[in-house]
Regions:
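Active-site nucleotide/adenylate-binding loops and adjacent lid/helix of ATP-dependent enzymes
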Residues: 2-9, 13-16, 95-101, 105, ...
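Short hydrophobic segments within beta-strands
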Residues: 7-9, 79, 214
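Conserved N-proximal alpha/beta basic substrate-recognition cap immediately N-terminal to
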Residues: 11-13, 18-137
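Short secondary-structure junctions
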Residues: 56, 128-129, 153, 261-268
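A short beta-strand motif that forms the metal-chelation/ATP-contact edge
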Residues: 73-78, 210-213, 280-292
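Glycine-rich phosphate/pyrophosphate-binding beta-alpha loops
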Residues: 82, 167, 227-229, 287-297
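Phosphate-binding site of ATP-dependent enzymes
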Residues: 171-262, 275, 281-282
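ATP-dependent carboxylate activation and anion-phosphoryl transfer catalytic cores
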Residues: 247-313
C-alpha cells in the first residue's frame, strides 16, 4: 500500500474530524453527510475515496510539523497549506527538503514560481494574454498615487500583495483618498511588491472560468460568478449547469500549452482562471500550489488526479 501525505496546515485541520485525517478510519458517507455540503470538504472526501480505491493510504499532515518523517511517504501531495504565503521562505525550504526524501506534487520548482504573482509578468512576456497588471516595488514607492497606472476610478483598482492567497489583503479601490489610506495601512513597510489591476466587471456579468488540467490534459471546467457589490467569485450549483464550450476549451488548452513551453515543466495539476473579453481569453491567475480543483464537478476528476499521482511514484 502506497502512503500519500496530503500537505496541509493547522488552519485547515479545523475542517476535519481527527478520524478523517487518516484514511484507515475514513468513511466517505460520513464526511459527505457532515460536511455541510462544503465543496472543499466534499472534494476532500472524493480525493480520499479515489486514493483508497487505488490502495493508497492518505494522511493529512501539517507542512510545518517538525516531527514528520517524510521518508515514510511515497509521495506528498500539496493539498491545503493555506498559510504558506505568510511564511513563503520557510514553506519553500520545507518543500525543497521534502524533495530530497520523496516525490512532491507539484514540484518545488513549480511552487516557487507560482507562489509570487509576478509570474503574471512572465506570462505576458511570453505572449500569454493576462488582464492589465502593474507591479509596484513598495520599498521604492512612498507615494502610491504617483505610481498608479491610468485605470478608471469608476471601474476600480484592485490592490493585492504578489505573495498572497485567497482574499487576504485584497482591496477594490475607487478613490485616490482610499488608495493612499489602504496603501499606507496595509502595504507600506509590510509587503515587497504590490500588484495593481483594474477591477474586471466580467466576473459579475459573464463570470470567471476555472479550467483544470491533470497530467498535461484538460479535465474539466467550472463557471464562477461574483454577486452584485461583491468581488469574490464562487462556484454554485446553479453555475454548475454551465459547461465550457469547445471554443473555450480549445483556447484554454492553447494557453496551457504555452505555459508549459514557457516553464519547461510537467505539473501534476494546474488550474487556469480566465475571463472572456472582446479580444479573447485573458488569464486572471494560474493556480499550481493548493488550488481548489472542483473534483465534484466531473465524475472521473478525482480518479484522473489519483492516476496521475500513481504514475509518478
Amino acid at each position: 500500500m502506497k502512503k500519500i501525505a496530503l500537505l496541509s496546515s493547522t488552519i485547515a485541520f479545523g475542517l476535519f474530524e481527527p478520524e478523517h485525517r487518516d484514511a484507515r478510519t475514513f468513511s466517505y458517507e460520513k464526511v459527505a453527510s457532515t460536511a455541510d455540503l462544503s465543496h472543499f470538504t466534499l472534494d476532500y472526501a472524493l480525493l480520499l475515496q479515489a486514493l483508497t480505491d487505488q490502495h493508497c493510504l492518505p494522511t493529512l499532515v501539517a507542512w510545518n510539523d517538525p516531527h514528520i518523517d517524510w521518508r515514510a511517504f511515497d509521495a506528498v501531495l500539496i493539498h491545503s497549506p493555506w498559510d504558506y504565503y505568510e511564511h513563503q521562505d520557510a514553506f519553500l525550504n520545507v518543500l525543497r527538503d521534502i524533495e530530497t526524501h520523496t516525490v512532491v506534487l507539484n514540484s518545488w520548482k513549480t511552487v516557487a514560481w507560482n507562489s509570487d504573482k509576478k509570474y503574471l509578468q512572465d506570462l505576458s512576456d511570453a505572449g500569454i494574454p493576462i488582464i492589465p497588471s502593474a507591479f509596484i516595488n513598495v520599498a521604492k514607492t512612498p507615494d502610491i498615487l504617483a505610481a498608479l497606472p491610468n485605470y478608471n476610478w469608476t471601474q476600480g483598482y484592485v490592490f493585492k500583495p504578489t505573495v498572497s492567497a485567497g482574499a487576504s489583503n485584497v482591496f477594490v479601490i475607487t478613490s485616490s483618498e482610499q488608495a493612499a489610506k489602504i496603501y499606507t495601512q496595509y502595504f507600506l513597510n509590510k509587503h515587497n511588491t504590490l500588484l495593481v489591476q483594474p477591477f474586471m466587471e466580467e466576473i459579475r456579468t459573464e463570470g470567471e472560468w476555472s479550467l483544470i488540467f491533470f497530467e498535461g490534459h484538460y479535465s474539466h471546467g467550472v463557471l464562477k460568478k461574483a454577486e452584485a457589490e461583491n468581488i469574490w467569485v464562487k462556484h454554485s450549483m446553479e453555475n454548475q449547469k454551465h459547461l465550457p464550450d469547445e471554443s473555450l476549451i480549445k483556447a484554454s488548452v492553447a494557453i496551457y500549452q504555452r505555459l508549459i513551453a514557457l516553464r519547461q515543466d510537467s505539473p501534476l495539476y494546474t488550474r487556469i482562471d480566465v475571463i472572456k473579453r472582446i479580444e479573447g481569453l485573458c488569464v486572471m491567475e494560474v493556480e499550481q500550489i493548493e488550488p481548489y480543483l472542483y473534483l465534484h464537478a466531473k465524475a472521473d476528476a478525482a480518479k484522473k488526479l489519483v492516476a496521475g499521482i500513481i504514475k509518478r511514484l
